[in-house]
Amino acid sequence: MPRLARRIYGIENEYGITCTQRGQRRLSPDEVARYLFRRVVSWGRSSNVFLENGARLYLDVGSHPEYATPECDSLSDLVAHDKAGERILESLAHSAEAKMREEGIRGDVFLLKNNTDSAGNSYGCHENYLTVRVDDLTRLVEVLIPFLVSRQIIAGAGKVLLTSRGPLYAVSQRAEHIWEGVSSATTRSRPIINTRDEPHADAERYRRLHVIVGDSNMSQWATYLKVGAMAIVLRLLEEEVVLRDLTLENPIRAIREIAHDTELERTVRLVNGRELTGLEIQEAYFERAERYHERIGLPADEARALDMWREALKALRANDHEALFGKVDWVTKLTLIEAFRARHQLPLSHPQVSLLDLQYHDISRERGLFARLEAKGRVPRIVDDETIERAVDEPPATTRAALRGRFIRAAKEAHRDYTVDWVHLKLNDQAQRTVMLKDPFASEDERVDRLLTSI
């Protein structure tokens, strides 16, 4: 399998939305979403827009605001742009509250970067990886599914789950809602890997791998590790490194088994009859990656992710949750919940515990539990506030997003009507001039320069 010198990454996060006044629900999610997107519609004439930083912001099915980062070719850029999405939506929430007040509606708009609501509906965090096109996806899928099923132990967001057998704390939010290993649908069957073939690039050379099994992360550290570890495994596949056969007998049962065991001791069965824990599966991938790094070397981004992967697995092996506080979301939230329960003598099923679970994911920097930990310096960061604020306005400089951002900015300043998507830039004038950008790595293009000059 040929390899990529650079890789393109992107993350799409859907957000939960609600509006309450003194704890009571004030507006339906649909009504809140309309207020939230009023500012967007006023300048974009649509609730589906591309922004000057190259990202896409739109209202998804079920009144979920969704932010898709621009194309990033570094993990730290990706973290910055993922966090920029939170800032952009937080700003829209403030505008929505102000507009509601003008119309005599008092209420707080909550945007939650989580994956399930109180009614049991699930919404996603989708990761995108550019890969080299191969004719047969079988090998790719065989290797990736056990990795992704077990990756929740380092990247899960955690959740209090109320089941018929009583409450439990689950490692992953999405695990309950995944029904297939591989599928071309995202909502109906909720697979681990979505195979719908939309590369948003030269289809003869590239494929866009669409992973929909992951949780949304509050922790920058977890986002970096989640995507970084996946990038390393893709590199091993591209380099045709021999990997142990870890094919799971039943991936869907396995993902739930691993999710329901915070001690990480429960085993899952492989096709070859062996039984391994999720931690052992992750360690098997990590050991192969470490050997590759010692022999050949990983790029700096991935080498940093490898160090973080080692740190996470070592702490989980030692059951050292303190070492992962502020880094791994499910561990951080569980630590907060256990302390809260002990202080107030509350059962796991208590509504106050469920409320704390939600508050962890509130993107408001005033209210959000994780945000408050960050403000107190209790959380390690990959990027600082200045970098995030820059990402709110500016696209990554080294990918196609730079061209899209320049075009949008120029067209808006000149009050020109335009249409853009991931691949096309179009001026809606008599000439209907369109530029098609098939290379996601190209941040300069003479055709775009000419289009900008004509504006």
From Swiss-Prot:
Pfam families tied to this protein: Pup_ligase
Chain residues that bind ATP: 56, 69, 422
Top-level enzyme category: ligase
InterPro entries for this protein: Pup_ligase, Pup_ligase/deamidase
Keywords: ATP-binding, Ligase, Magnesium, Metal-binding, Nucleotide-binding, Ubl conjugation pathway
Assigned EC number: 6.3.1.19
Catalytic reactions on record: ATP + [prokaryotic ubiquitin-like protein]-L-glutamate + [protein]-L-lysine = ADP + phosphate + N(6)-([prokaryotic ubiquitin-like protein]-gamma-L-glutamyl)-[protein]-L-lysine
Gene Ontology MF: a single term: ubiquitin-like protein transferase activity
Biochemical pathway: Protein degradation; proteasomal Pup-dependent pathway; Protein modification; protein pupylation
Keyword match Cytoplasm: no
GO biological process: modification-dependent protein catabolic process; proteasomal protein catabolic process; protein pupylation
Active site residues according to the UniProt entry: 60
Record function comment: Catalyzes the covalent attachment of the prokaryotic ubiquitin-like protein modifier Pup to the proteasomal substrate proteins, thereby targeting them for proteasomal degradation. This tagging system is termed pupylation. The ligation reaction involves the side-chain carboxylate of the C-terminal glutamate of Pup and the side-chain amino group of a substrate lysine.
Further details from the record: The reaction mechanism probably proceeds via the activation of Pup by phosphorylation of its C-terminal glutamate, which is then subject to nucleophilic attack by the substrate lysine, resulting in an isopeptide bond and the release of phosphate as a good leaving group.
NCBIfam families in the cross-refs: pupylate_PafA
Full protein name: Pup--protein ligase
Lineage: Bacteria, Bacillati, Actinomycetota, Acidimicrobiia, Acidimicrobiales
Gene designation per UniProt: pafA
